[in-house]
Amino acid sequence: KIHMLQYLSDIDMPKGVVVISHGFTESAVKYDEVAYYFLKEGYHVYIPEHCGHGRSYRLTADPSLVHIDTWRRYIRDFLKACRYIKKAHPDLSLNLYAHSMGGAIGGIAAAWEPDWFHKVILSSPMIRPLTDNVPWPAATGIALEKCIFGKDEEYVAGRKPYDGSGSFETSSATSKPRYERYKNLRAEHKELQTWSPSYGWLWASAEMSWYLRLYGWKKYTAPMLLIQAQTEDLVSVRALKNFAGKINRQGKTSCDYIHMIGTKHEIYGSRGKILEKYWGYIFTFLDDTENDIDHR
């Protein structure tokens, strides 16, 4: 089963609905603050947890391991959640906010069902993951070989089970209180202790990347906002720029591209003034009616 958090706005006329697609090793509760800002602006918010994360179902008994058998499972599950949301709010537009791995999942979902989404916000999306010091072709080749020989549930080399380690200095956030809040939650709740990828996940991430870069970009009709962090160690910036460029050159819709100075990969985990600017960009984009298409 897919676990999903629901936050309903208490205003009389909500602006719409936002579905959040979280990132690798994350969970719905990490996005409490993100949900709060959308609620304040008059949106209902839903946060489904992807397979292998939080309280959703898993394909492995190891609570530290993020494993998937096929990338399509992520997309099917996410669209199933979106279908439920659309049925619950048939008169409201559905908007997508997606981060990192969730950007790949949400991005493909919006390519499979372009008419479902009113506007799409991709924050540090995983158009192509970075693979540390291993070249991308070598990393994907190793992952494929492991999957072929039945070792898809093995930890990727150099990765390990959750042990409570990790520091703010090496994290993807720039706000220490925001970082420490989730670190403490993770230490207290076993279901939040997803930590490392399997070779099956690595191969699935490669297949999602190829789909987005070869096919997905052609299918969008909803206006898109893509926000890139200044310091980025987890996703390819070149892939982000190429992805946005192809969407804009095709001309079916627009992809606004913003480079956020003073941020790391988790832009939503930034400090004061930078975070205010980030949310300013997002709500200006959502409030802009110039390119609106009715996708209810």
Name each model feature, range by range.
Residues S254-D256, M260-R296:
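Catalytic active-site module of serine/aspartate enzymes centered on a nucleophile-bearing elbow/loop
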Residues V66-K86:
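Alpha/beta-hydrolase active-site loop
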